Amino acid sequence: MGLKEQFRKPIHKQDLFSVIYQALFMAFTGGILIGAVLLLMIRLLGFELSWLMLFVLAMLTARRIKQATYEKHIIFSIISVLAFILGYYIMNVTAYAGMIFTTTGSVSNIPFDLILNPVYYFYFLYPLSSTFFQVSNILEIVFFVIAIHYAFKYSK
């Protein structure tokens, strides 16, 4: 079935609302929980496994959206990818706000204008940055694209 035919399939309103609800739920709760686990790993173990957290977030988002539908539609997969990207943003906000809080010991010292800026968390995708061709950045991009593909494919 071609891409045009997949978009022409009818969308059931009940499925659409259920998918949007589940996507937002997983983006917020999954992002907060996985961000807290990422913070715990950075603080206690001293290293970061954000690529592993990407797969966990993509898996949880795709599974939750797949269970929320009766009939499959390509819009649901696109919503899954958008929920994954929102969850990735919330995961990073949670982890970095927690790191600043545990370092300074006060909520008033957290620079919310920097913490809530999404450009900071998605800067690794910017091809004109000076760090774009570093090995760690290339690995981050590869795992991010694989996680997006996973969220798209397995939410069908």
Language model region names:
Residues 2-55:
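Transmembrane alpha-helical insertion/packing segments
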Residues 57, 62-156:
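Core subunits and conserved enzymes of cellular information-processing
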